Amino acid sequence: MTDRKTNSARDRFMSAICRVAAVALVGSALSGCVAADMALDDVPKAPPQIPAKVLAEMSKKGMKAESPVLVRIFKQESELEVWKMDGSGRYALLKTYPMCRWSGKLGPKTKDGDRQAPEGFYHVSSGMLNPKSQYYVSFNLGYPNRLESALGYTGESLMVHGACSSSGCYALTDQGVGEIYAVVSKALSSGQDRFQVQAYPFRMTPENMALHKDDANLPFWKTLKEGYDAFELTRQQPKVSVCGRRYVFNTEFEGGEPRDPLAACPATAKPSDPQLVAKIALEKQKVEAAVTKASSSTVMSYVDGGMHPSFRQLLKKDGPEKLAARISSIKYPVSRPDAALADPFKAMTKRTGAGQVADAPRGD
């Protein structure tokens, strides 16, 4: 009887893997991970739990597993940060995870099929978590958000998931995304209604902004930097509104939240924190000074997206098959491995005239 049950479970698992392979054949033609992130309902799998090492790190930093969480993503650096609220009521960095793969190039996602990974501000609720993802576990970023929908941007089901494969998603190791999933799931089940994801092209320092001074997305990135600075300066989650075709942060409006993202912003109900406004204004001045001083931007030669240097070294050393086996529990193939070997940002990290890419406080 035991052997019969074992064989039945094995057959269901192999059937699911066959479906995964079939989906993978068409996944590269899709704009997001929607078809490639099917739920494997007949494969028994318990949701990941927070590892003891991560719980110990939380305790060391004055955090509780139940406390609110916030996620930041940086394309150029191929890093994802998990922040937790500590005993002071402010957010502190818990851990930084290297991303194995993201697709497209720097800049927002605007249309179905452009392979772009989203940039902007997103909010993830428990219903957007997938514990039975083909890519181990995943959560949906919620693209397009209200602003993107109003602007006519198209695409759907852009995820953070496991395996080293991306078609508009952010991909990590199964172990890494399992930790992240467990941390955010615990926060959501403990009372946090939804957690904020801030997806950036790079760490939004004046020096990095200057490195991209000639990019057509610079005006959009300056808007993102306002939210970035608000978090950096306060360690509080910024309140995000949308009006005037852009994000607006930490602002109370007469009549409540603006209803039309494309209409001009209504009058404010009360002044924003003057000290914070002054500090953000100073950051804007630093950006303008750095951009003015910098020479023309280096033209980056994109093939397709990026990969954290640690994974690129493994890819060069071991090849895509061994890297896939190391990253993914089902050895899901690395997407476009030849493109992953290219580093379009290498020439930018040590340029004179605009400084180096800044280091953020890092987890272990």
Predicted regions and their residues:
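Bacterial N-terminal signal peptides that target proteins for export
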Residues: 4-21
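Bacterial N-terminal signal peptides
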Residues: 20-31
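Bacterial signal peptide processing site
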Residues: 34-36
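Short, low-complexity, disordered segments immediately C-terminal to signal peptides
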Residues: 38-48
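N-terminal post-signal-peptidase region of extra-cytosolic proteins
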Residues: 52-70, 82-84, 101-112, 119-125, ...
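Short Gly/aromatic-enriched secondary-structure transition segments
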Residues: 86-102
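Exported/periplasmic cell-wall-interacting domains
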Residues: 113-273
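Low-complexity, Gly/Ser/Thr/Pro-rich intrinsically disordered linker/tail segments
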Residues: 205-364
